[in-house]
């Protein structure tokens, strides 16, 4: 059960500690009256929510079971995207950029991922080396 204000009975649940304290203090009748009022409020909210939800248009996918695709061959392979070289740097500074276009990476997603990871590692190592050089000299 959700425990936020979207829950229909949140006001009843929130009042349970107060009603428990009243019951232990000898105010049983007051606690019972409070519980009845809270139950009436919850029933009223249920009734009004059902009334308003019935007026809404049904969902276009209501009553249909969700289909899950487990076979990866059901998806088209697609084309390999072409990434332009960054305009603020020469394309010769990046591995695989020929004439400003990324080439020779391979067609699979994993090839692109490995290429990006290699570039990040190279860049990080160069920056760390640069930092060491600056701090040493």
UniProtKB/Swiss-Prot annotation:
GO cellular component, one term: membrane
Species this chain originates from: Frog virus 3 (isolate Goorha) (FV-3)
Location(s), subcellular: Host membrane
Keywords noted in UniProt: Host membrane, Membrane, Transmembrane, Transmembrane helix
Membrane association type: Single-pass membrane protein
Annotated protein name in UniProt: Uncharacterized protein 010R
Domain of life: Viruses
Membrane-crossing segments per the record: 20-42
